[in-house]
Regions:
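Acidic catalytic/metal-coordinating carboxylates
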Residues: 32, 58-61
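The feature encodes the CheY-like receiver
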Residues: 55, 83, 101-102
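Short amphipathic alpha-helix used as the core "switch/output" element in two-component signaling
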Residues: 60-71
Length: 119
């Protein structure tokens, strides 16, 4: 399974990338919103793990742009911002699901598998 990880925090990104690779996933890591849109448009992914707060474009703008590109890849937003308004705006931008930070890695794996199975 190929994952696009979009995370600007180097420590969080490195932790997630290493854990996902150990689970057998192929991981491409984008460090900002522009890089995320570029990678999403250039390759096929099974799921996109998308941080909300990013340099250059926030996660909502990234999700909306990915959808404008015609990508139907499931998007899981990883964020501490999970108010009802944030969730509503995310859904409107094309986000499939939210996961609040902090989270347990095993819970992330469960959510990844559930979203990919739905597709």
């Amino acid at each position: 399974m190929r994952i696009l990880l979009v995370e600007d925090d180097r420590k969080v990104g490195a932790f997630l990338e290493e854990g996902l690779r150990q689970e057998g996933f192929l991981v491409d890591w984008a460090h900002d919103g522009d890089e995320a849109v570029e990678l999403a448009g250039a390759a096929a992914y099974d799921i996109i793990l998308l941080d909300f707060m990013l340099p250059k474009r926030n996660g909502l703008h990234v999700a909306a742009e990915i959808r404008r590109l015609g990508q139907e890849t499931p998007i899981l937003m990883l964020t501490a911002r999970d108010s009802a308004d944030d969730v509503r705006r995310g859904r409107a931008a094309g986000v499939n699901d939210y996961m609040g930070k902090p989270f347990k890695f095993d819970d992330l794996l469960d959510r990844i598998h559930a979203l990919v199975r739905q597709e």
